[in-house]
Regions:
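Conserved beta-strand-loop-short alpha-helix elements that form
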Residues: 1-16, 67, 105-109, 187-188
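Membrane-interacting alpha-helical segments
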Residues: 8-15, 32-37, 74-85
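Glycine-rich, phosphate-binding/catalytic loops in enzymes
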Residues: 16-20, 120-122
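Helix-loop-helix
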Residues: 21-48
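Catalytic core of PPM/PP2C metal-dependent serine/threonine phosphatase domains
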Residues: 39-67
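Short conserved micro-motifs on helix faces and helix-strand junctions that flank
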Residues: 58, 103-105
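Non-transmembrane, aqueous-exposed alpha-helical and coiled segments at domain scale
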Residues: 71-101, 110, 114-231
């Protein structure tokens, strides 16, 4: 971190010589309280605390970079039904056996997993984003969203950034992605007849092209390890 962090608070009654060694103490305490904190969030907390030390008027360049050496966080995102219905069971087993966070994007995808694994699927009525259908819930699955609309918005948020105080299924998925190291997509290639209307906006491309855009952004902008499997 820059000296804007270590020298923050300099001249104040409780930090006459700046934050100095207190930075290390703060980091140790934060890691003790939040052992799973991401590098991004820890860096953000350090900079925000430095800003607070300077009464929210930073007096110098204040930068912080955190490198977190740990076992990679894995995320599985499944979207779309397999081309061959005989592969439904294979998809469900892939989801069941995956070691990491699990996301299902699409009602058909969620229905397949629910049926094959005999797990109840519950649909929420809470609308948190007027552009998108609400979330669904299933035991063992971390996030269940609508499919192509949600993925299209995820691509937009990754490109433009997340507006302050915004929320919704796409935001939830972006947060999971940003806190993961390796993202594995399983993309079903069966065509969804609901998206064959030629009057739909251009942004609603077939799901595999949207996923390709997301993969490119994650690899080039966010330095994530991304793998796509088509089914």
């Amino acid at each position: 971190f820059s000296d804007g962090v270590s020298q923050s608070g300099m001249g104040s009654s409780n930090m006459p010589f700046g934050w100095d060694e207190g930075v290390g103490i703060y980091i140790a305490e934060t890691l003790s309280q939040h052992p799973g904190i991401s590098a991004k969030e820890l860096a953000r907390k350090i900079v925000l605390r430095a800003e607070r030390n300077d009464n929210y008027r930073l007096l110098d360049d204040t930068s912080c970079c955190v490198i977190y050496r740990r076992t990679p966080r894995n995320l599985l995102i499944c979207t779309g039904p397999p081309y061959d219905e005989k592969k439904d069971r294979y998809l469900a087993e892939k989801v069941r056996d995956f070691k990491g966070k699990k996301v299902l994007c699409g009602g058909t995808t969620a229905t397949i997993i629910s049926r094959e694994l005999q797990l109840p699927l519950q649909v929420s009525m809470d609308i948190t984003d007027k552009e998108l259908p609400p979330l669904s819930y299933m035991e063992g699955i971390d996030l269940i969203t609508e499919g192509i609309l949600t993925l299209s918005k995820v691509e937009r948020l990754l490109t433009q950034g997340i507006p302050e105080k915004s929320q919704g299924p796409a935001n939830d998925l972006v947060n999971l992605i940003q806190n993961s190291d390796k993202i594995t997509f399983i993309v079903g290639t069966r065509i969804n007849v609901a998206h064959q209307d030629p009057n739909l906006p251009v942004e609603l491309e077939i799901r595999r092209n949207v996923v390709k855009k997301i993969k490119y952004l994650l690899e080039t902008k966010f330095l994530k390890d991304v793998e796509i499997t088509y089914l």
